[in-house]
């Protein structure tokens, strides 16, 4: 069994626990690692190892997150769990832990609570594609009708936020009993793992997506033309392929006539690599940092979008004062800042440091964007918030 661990051939899937405080997210995380280690090999993680989550920084924001790993026979999972509600909000908005799917933990003793709703809404806004439900503490509920009622409430709540509530897998279990080694409840953890394997599709790898490279620098090389450099965000660029230059200015088409890395010429540049791309017939001044190179027709420039944002607290180095509706900060997308104006939701007059809020942003220049793109909010180069494009509007 111990040989399992070194197999790097299994598909890698990112998941996490979400749900209301004290409904048992961390206990479930410990139970999954323990039961799966016992059944399929791998290492168990104790509750307290997960609970005192280390601090990490994402876009200048401090987040407490625990990362655990576990295996099923067909997949390798990386799982994130956060101790506090604020950590979840920050984590989901910054995309520090991108999830291919989430396990929503709901205590059968309480049913859905305010944070249950908020985490489902956040999941919808930030693009968590799949949710599986673990109905926890079922050992404490004898009444079958009550369990059915809670299940129905959870399904309705999911449907309300455009998740397929009627078809969502719901597992009735007890994380604590499973952790204590009770076989009846351990079986429920195996059932949950089975849903992870079958309900969450294998994520598309960055390399299989359409090519996109955020431009960091532009050089002109005499006799050869213009070179742009940056890290390939997704896909592959091959010499001879057509690309579009998108954002800030009118979209332009050109051809890649060369790819180089560390001064060596290559046939192609792949997701994750830092490359220089030589472009045919483009002048140095026609292209700038903040634009992207992309496979033609795969991404468009936009100026207006709905977003979900988290505003840093004073302790995190954010603003000391609230802001109001005339606020005009910079929005930092990929490699550049663009000034924008904001519209707050109806009835909201001001936003305090430490808040998370939905806002509509209008930028002064178009930026290549899709739903799910992350950004920072800055004032004079200092990060004061983080956000995600929930829906492109225009």
UniProtKB/Swiss-Prot annotation:
Q: Which residues bind Mg(2+)?
A: 26
Catalyzed reaction equations: GTP + H2O = GDP + phosphate + H(+)
Residue ranges of the region described as G4: 136-139
Q: Where is this region: G1?
A: 19-26
Main subcellular location: cytoplasm
- Region feature (G5): 174-176
Q: What class of enzyme is it?
A: hydrolase
Sites where the protein binds GTP: 19-26, 81-85, 136-139
MF terms from GO for this chain are: GTP binding; GTPase activity; guanosine tetraphosphate binding; translation elongation factor activity
Q: Which GO terms describe its cellular component?
A: cytosol
Cited Gene3D superfamilies: P-loop containing nucleotide triphosphate hydrolases, Translation factors
Question: Localized where?
Answer: Cytoplasm
Q: What is its EC number?
A: 3.6.5.3
Q: Does the keyword Acetylation apply?
A: no
Pfam families for this protein: GTP_EFTU, GTP_EFTU_D2, GTP_EFTU_D3
Supply the alphabetized keyword list.
Cytoplasm, Elongation factor, GTP-binding, Hydrolase, Magnesium, Metal-binding, Nucleotide-binding, Protein biosynthesis
Q: Where is this region: G2?
A: 60-64
Q: What segment(s) does the record annotate as region G3?
A: 81-84
Which InterPro entries does the UniProt record give?
A: EF-Tu_GTP-bd (IPR041709), EF-Tu_GTPase (IPR050055), EFTu-like_2 (IPR004161), EFTU_2 (IPR033720), G_TR_CS (IPR031157), P-loop_NTPase (IPR027417), Small_GTP-bd (IPR005225), T_Tr_GTP-bd_dom (IPR000795)
Cell inner membrane in keyword set:
no
Q: PANTHER family per the record?
A: ELONGATION FACTOR TU, MITOCHONDRIAL, ELONGATION FACTOR TU-RELATED
Q: How does it assemble?
A: Monomer.
Q: Member of which family?
A: Belongs to the TRAFAC class translation factor GTPase superfamily. Classic translation factor GTPase family. EF-Tu/EF-1A subfamily.
Q: What does this protein do?
A: GTP hydrolase that promotes the GTP-dependent binding of aminoacyl-tRNA to the A-site of ribosomes during protein biosynthesis.
HAMAP family given in the database record = EF_Tu_B
For this entry, the protein name equals Elongation factor Tu
Organism this protein belongs to:
Klebsiella pneumoniae subsp. pneumoniae (strain ATCC 700721 / MGH 78578)
């Amino acid at each position: 069994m111990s040989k399992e661990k070194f197999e790097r051939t299994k598909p890698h899937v990112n998941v996490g626990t979400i749900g209301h405080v004290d409904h048992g997210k961390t206990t479930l995380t410990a139970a999954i690692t323990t039961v799966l280690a016992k059944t399929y090999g791998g290492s168990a993680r104790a509750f307290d190892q997960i609970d005192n989550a280390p601090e990490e920084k994402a876009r200048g924001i401090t987040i407490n997150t625990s990362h655990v790993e576990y295996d099923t026979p067909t997949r390798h999972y990386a799982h994130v769990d956060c101790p506090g509600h604020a950590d979840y909000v920050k984590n989901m908005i910054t995309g520090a832990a991108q999830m291919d799917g989430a396990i929503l933990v709901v205590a059968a003793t309480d049913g859905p609570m305010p944070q249950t709703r908020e985490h489902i809404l956040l999941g919808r806004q930030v693009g968590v594609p799949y949710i599986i439900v673990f109905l926890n503490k079922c050992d404490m509920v004898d009444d079958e009708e009550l369990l059915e009622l809670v299940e129905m409430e959870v399904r309705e709540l999911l449907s309300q936020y455009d998740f397929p509530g009627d078809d969502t897998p719901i597992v009735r279990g007890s994380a604590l009993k499973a952790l204590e080694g009770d076989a009846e409840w351990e079986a429920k953890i195996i059932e949950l793992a089975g849903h992870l394997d079958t309900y969450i599709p294998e994520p598309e790898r960055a390399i299989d997506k359409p090519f996109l490279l955020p431009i960091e620098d532009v050089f002109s090389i005499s006799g050869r033309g213009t070179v742009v450099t940056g890290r390939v965000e997704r896909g592959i660029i091959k010499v001879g392929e057509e690309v579009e230059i998108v954002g800030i200015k009118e979209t332009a088409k050109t051809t890649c006539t060369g790819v180089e890395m560390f001064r060596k010429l290559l046939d192609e540049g792949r997701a994750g690599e830092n490359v220089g791309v030589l472009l045919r017939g483009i002048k140095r001044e026609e292209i700038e940092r903040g634009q992207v190179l992309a496979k033609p027709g795969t991404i468009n420039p936009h100026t207006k979008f709905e977003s979900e944002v988290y505003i840093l607290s004073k302790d995190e180095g954010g603003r000391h004062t609230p802001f109001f509706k005339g606020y005009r900060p910079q929005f930092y997308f990929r490699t550049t800042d663009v000034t924008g104006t904001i519209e707050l939701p109806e009835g909201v007059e001001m936003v305090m440091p430490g808040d998370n809020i939905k806002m509509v942003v209008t930028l002064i220049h178009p930026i290549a964007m899709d739903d799910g793109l992350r950004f920072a909010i800055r004032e004079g180069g200092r990060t004061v918030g983080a956000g995600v494009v929930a829906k492109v509007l225009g």
